[in-house]
A protein has these predicted regions:
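Bacterial N-terminal signal peptides
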Residues: 1-8
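Carboxylate/His-rich catalytic cores and anion/metal-binding grooves
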Residues: 102, 372-384
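Short glycine/proline/serine/threonine-rich loop/turn segments at secondary-structure transition edges
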Residues: 179-182, 222-226, 298-301, 349-362
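Short acidic/polar inter-strand loop motif in beta-rich domains
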Residues: 235-241, 370-377
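Intrinsically disordered, low-complexity Pro/Gly/Ser/Thr-rich segments with frequent PxxP/GP/PP motifs
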Residues: 322-350
Length: 384
């Protein structure tokens, strides 16, 4: 095992990023997609991409499909398309809404492509390719973005008829009984370009930024049995001025959708930085962990600790991982107010296998959050 060093530092709660909001809203105003000052509502702030697992054995798989706390929502969804916002279905998010006349599509998809018919007809609008221009009417001048995305273009514009397409999606899902008592999140890995989300008729939030994950804590809105998820996607929003580069502009839920679960007391974020000495013979793994508690039962939790284990596993192998280093932190106290408790940990590895193009190699870091009795509260993992 490698030499270990641990320190813990309490920090104040992270300020919300500008443009993110979390106040209670019954319904959206409907103008968020053309409000540059509003970036997201109800959406988790950016963090590292990793998952919770039930056991260390699961965690060594790293990928979400290996986890008991992951459920894919890909597959059949009900779908309704309109060419302009004023034509959209207003109350489709209500659980009792009858969507039997809607089409059934397979998510992930880009609706322009999905709607191409064998006879050449376009059921869900036109795929648009542009280099550095935006598909809606604009002018190259200072502050032109203030004119928005709904200006009337010349008649030869593809978007003259369909000024800003809107796709409405609906599906039902059930949460595993084994997730009871945990925080449940719905995750959208890519939605072009703006969307609202409702669960069981309750407004959850919205997101801009097509190419990054958008996660929402939907725990307060869930019920036992069948739940209804509704999503309304807009082709363009004020952020589309920034998402303009050499590519096809294809709206829709174009990447995976999933449910994930984490305990109320959790490893919220993780930063892992490897470092080598001048000889490349000695490595240090610097780990920064953001711990948080959203438990309503306890005001604070005493005696928590973190245990990190580093496993060696050659690339492309699924079995045979060997533990090469381990570190356990000192005990700490965590308040149940959602504020972060930052823990920094260092792990030493002698004669590490180095990554190269000729002989790629990677390690698996497994983290376990322990209570004062040594019981595992959460297990996470990542490649390094």
């Amino acid at each position: 095992m490698g030499l270990t060093l641990t320190t813990s530092v309490a920090m104040q709660a992270q300020a919300n990023l500008k443009g993110f909001s979390y106040d209670k809203q019954e319904q959206p105003t409907g103008q968020e997609w053309q409000s540059p000052e509003a970036y997201a509502h109800g959406k988790l702030q950016p963090r590292a991409h990793f998952y919770s697992f039930k056991t260390v054995s699961e965690a060594l798989g790293v990928l979400p499909e290996k986890s008991s706390y992951y459920q894919s929502l890909n597959g059949a969804w009900r779908f309704h398309w309109v060419g302009n916002p004023e034509e959209r279905e207003v109350n489709f998010f209500k659980p009792e809404y009858n969507d039997e006349k809607w089409d059934t599509v397979n998510v992930p998809m880009s609706w322009n492509i999905y709607g191409l018919q064998k006879d050449g007809k376009q059921k869900y609008g036109t795929p648009i390719y542009l280099n550095q221009r935006v598909p809606f009417f604009h002018q190259v001048k200072v502050d032109d973005w203030k004119g928005g995305v709904m200006r009337t273009p010349p008649e030869n514009y593809t978007m003259y008829k369909h000024r800003n397409e809107v796709g409405a999606y609906r599906r039902t899902f059930s949460v595993p009984s084994s997730w009871e008592g945990q925080s449940v999140y719905v995750n959208f890995d890519g939605v072009d370009s703006f969307f609202y989300i409702w669960v069981n008729g309750h407004y959850v939030g919205f997101s801009k930024n097509s190419r990054n994950r958008a996660s929402f804590d939907i725990s307060p809105y869930l019920k036992q049995g069948e739940n209804t998820l509704a999503v309304e996607v807009y082709r363009n929003n004020d952020g589309s001025f920034l998402e303009s580069q050499d590519m096809f502009r294809l709206p829709g839920i174009f990447r995976s959708v999933s449910l994930t679960a984490k305990p109320k007391v959790q490893i919220h974020d993780l930063q892992v930085t490897p470092d080598l000495d001048a000889t490349y013979q000695h490595a240090t793994l610097n780990i920064k962990t953001d711990l948080r508690s959203y438990s309503s039962k306890l005001k604070q939790l005493k005696g928590l600790s973190l245990r990190y284990s580093l496993y060696s596993l050659p690339l492309y192998l699924d079995e045979g991982a060997k533990r090469v280093a381990e570190v356990q932190s000192e005990a700490l106290t965590l308040k149940s107010d959602g504020a972060p408790q930052m823990l920094t940990t260092s792990m030493s590895v002698e004669s590490p296998n180095l990554w190269s193009a000729e002989a790629p190699y990677r390690y698996i870091l497994v983290g376990e959050l322990l209570d004062k009795k040594g019981n595992v509260l959460e297990t996470v993992s990542t490649y390094t």
